[in-house]
């Protein structure tokens, strides 16, 4: 953590996780959002990686801390620890592989088993640039998202379609919940989530308020 | 058996002819794994060259023709062997020596035809998973770069064969980087048996726990690393605790791929030299790297000698027992 500055200024720190089957494009969505890069020849993710990006959401400076997890089933032993404290999740499937969409239900169960019920989840159909290979119809995914109360978007990390939009939408929805909580006057601490602590979006610690600038 | 490698990137690589590669075959424009920053000898002087020649001659003598003298030498002078391995196995002999010290050469000789059988006649439930990762394994290395080229085909064969050989483990992401590293130094069949020697345990404890359901051995190593950091570098341990950094965040991929995934390539090779012969993961090196980071932490010639001065073996054994006691399902012996 060379050069880390504790006094870096932001109003909120939101922790997000990227989940979904192996090879759906999680790492490239992350690098497109945080560095505006796409790599056709990237390595498989082993274990976990993370990146951050600071952005403005409804006038507030929000730092997104995004955890990118390996998709293979066997890794669940390590990756599920990263769900803890997450206030947002992007559940990603590959629009050209129907099996990755069918697995979304399982990923969702897994996620909900480890996180607060108020977590903001967006279903993402990635690789939508491959139009001639689409195997998952938009309507089908939309219906699933509605049934499960998820936000939904189709993206392409390759040509950058909707990537910024998807992350911004998730961050905005989280911010809405948090600021509503502030107005309601719910007590919040300014600590990072501790180990083993259950995070509640309503009274959480992981939705970090900084500098006291927006507490009232 | 061992493939010809390019020297200093001036000659052509085996797969593509005019792409500049470093002396290990990684594309030059790629920074990940590139040894450029860490290799001291950018311009090899003639004295360096002579020293290298002498070293190779000593090694050849020690090994004998095709490894015939090796066992004898190890028995007679274990300390000399150990010292020489710690200084780094000459690159041109690395593949052969790795097979000798891991015990994989014996496995190969005892199982004629088995590898071919596994590759040609058996089918694996993991085939699609393997294929999905093939082009995502060392994508910046000339040998693995070409789609369906010899590198990718060998990698597929070795991984598929292993997934059939041990259906409990099957294929787990990360194994590809180990197989890939081996394939840069030996033939497919040799790489397969070294993988078997490593995971099933030929001359040392099996490491298949890295890939079993629940990744028990990875969890054990993470626990040990965390404990050692707290004990040996208390200030850093404290800082990690405060920032809620736990070792699974930075070290899972080190253990799952035995350092072949993201370490600078020359360092990964030197770690493998010692790891295969001394039969343990280089916790000393990790501790040392964390202590000195970032200056010089990734230069093998600086890191390794200093790391040997840190003694952790005894404490590691204690921590292994402690971990196994506190976990209901112990790591398979």
Curated annotation (Swiss-Prot), chain A:
Any one GO MF annotation of this record: GTP binding
SMART domains: RAB, RAN, RAS, RHO
Lineage of the species this protein comes from: Eukaryota, Viridiplantae, Streptophyta, Embryophyta, Tracheophyta
Similarity remark: Belongs to the small GTPase superfamily. Rab family.
Annotated knockout phenotype: Slight increase of primary root elongation and lateral root branching and hypersensitivity of root growth in response to exogenous auxin.
Organism of derivation: Arabidopsis thaliana
Top-level taxon of origin: Eukaryota
Keyword Transcription annotated: no
Assigned keywords, A-Z: Cell membrane, GTP-binding, Lipoprotein, Membrane, Nucleotide-binding, Prenylation, Protein transport, Transport
GO biological process: cell wall biogenesis; protein transport; response to auxin
Binding site for GTP: 20-27, 68-72, 126-129, 156-157
SUPFAM superfamilies: P-loop containing nucleoside triphosphate hydrolases
Membrane topology according to the record: Lipid-anchor
Predominant subcellular localization, coarse grouping: membrane
Covalently attached lipid (S-geranylgeranyl cysteine), positions: 213-214
Induction notes from the record: By auxin.
CDD domains: Rab11_like (cd01868)
Remarks, miscellaneous: Plants overexpressing RABA1A show reduced growth of roots and shoots and smaller leaf sizes.
Motif annotated as Effector region, chain positions: 42-50
One term under GO cellular component: cytosol
Name this protein carries in UniProt: Ras-related protein RABA1a
Subcellular location per the Swiss-Prot or TrEMBL entry: Cell membrane
């Amino acid at each position: 953590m060379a050069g880390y500055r504790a006094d870096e200024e932001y109003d909120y720190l939101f922790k997000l996780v990227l989940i979904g089957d192996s090879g759906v494009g999680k790492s490239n969505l992350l690098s497109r959002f945080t560095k505006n890069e796409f790599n056709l020849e990237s390595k498989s993710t082993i274990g976990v990686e993370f990146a951050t990006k600071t952005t403005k959401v409804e006038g507030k400076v929000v730092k997104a801390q995004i955890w990118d997890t390996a998709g293979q089933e066997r890794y669940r032993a390590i990756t599920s620890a990263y769900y803890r404290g997450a206030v947002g999740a992007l559940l990603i499937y590959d629009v050209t592989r129907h099996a990755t969409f069918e697995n979304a239900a399982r990923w969702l169960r897994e996620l909900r088993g480890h996180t607060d019920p108020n977590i903001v989840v967006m279903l993402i159909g990635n690789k939508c640039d491959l139009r001639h290979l689409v195997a998952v119809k938009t309507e089908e995914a939309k219906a699933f998202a509605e049934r499960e109360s998820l936000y939904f978007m189709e993206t392409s990390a390759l040509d950058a379609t909707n990537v910024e939009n998807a992350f911004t939408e998730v961050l905005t929805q989280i911010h809405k919940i948090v600021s509503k909580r502030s107005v309601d006057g719910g007590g919040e601490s300014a600590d990072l989530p501790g180990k083993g602590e259950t995070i509640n979006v309503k009274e959480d610690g992981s939705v970090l308020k900084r500098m006291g600038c927006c507490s009232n | 058996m061992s493939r010809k490698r390019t020297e200093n990137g001036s000659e052509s690589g085996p797969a593509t002819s005019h792409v500049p590669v470093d002396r290990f075959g990684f594309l030059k424009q790629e920074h990940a794994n590139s040894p450029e920053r860490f290799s001291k000898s950018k311009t090899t002087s003639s004295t360096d060259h002579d020293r290298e020649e002498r070293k190779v001659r000593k090694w050849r003598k020690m090994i004998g023709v095709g490894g015939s003298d090796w066992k004898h030498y190890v028995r007679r002078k274990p300390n000399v062997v150990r010292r020489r391995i710690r200084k780094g196995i000459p690159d041109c002999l690395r593949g052969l020596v790795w097979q000798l010290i891991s015990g994989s050469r014996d496995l190969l000789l005892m199982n004629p035809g088995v590898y071919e059988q596994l590759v040609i006649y058996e089918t694996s439930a993991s085939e699609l998973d393997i294929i999905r990762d093939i082009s995502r394994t060392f994508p910046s290395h000339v040998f693995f770069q070409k789609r369906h080229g010899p590198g990718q085909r060998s990698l597929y064969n070795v991984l598929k064969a292993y997934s059939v050989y041990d259906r409990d483990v099957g294929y787990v992401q990360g194994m590809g980087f180990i197989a890939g590293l081996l394939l840069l130094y030996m033939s497919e069949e040799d790489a397969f048996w070294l993988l078997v020697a490593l995971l099933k345990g030929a001359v040392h404890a099996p490491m298949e726990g890295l890939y079993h359901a629940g990744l028990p051995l990875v969890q054990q190593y993470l626990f040990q690393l965390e404990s050692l950091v707290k004990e040996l570098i208390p200030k850093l341990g404290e800082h990690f605790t405060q920032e809620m950094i736990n070792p699974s965040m930075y070290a899972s991929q080190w253990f799952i791929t035995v350092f072949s995934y993201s370490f600078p390539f020359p360092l990964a090779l030197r770690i493998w030299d010692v790891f295969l012969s001394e039969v343990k993961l280089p916790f000393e090196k990790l501790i040392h790297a964390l202590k000195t980071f970032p200056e010089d932490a990734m230069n093998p010639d600086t890191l390794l000698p200093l790391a040997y001065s840190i003694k952790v073996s005894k404490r590691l054994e204690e921590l292994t027992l402690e971990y196994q006691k506190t976990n209901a399902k112990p790591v398979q012996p």
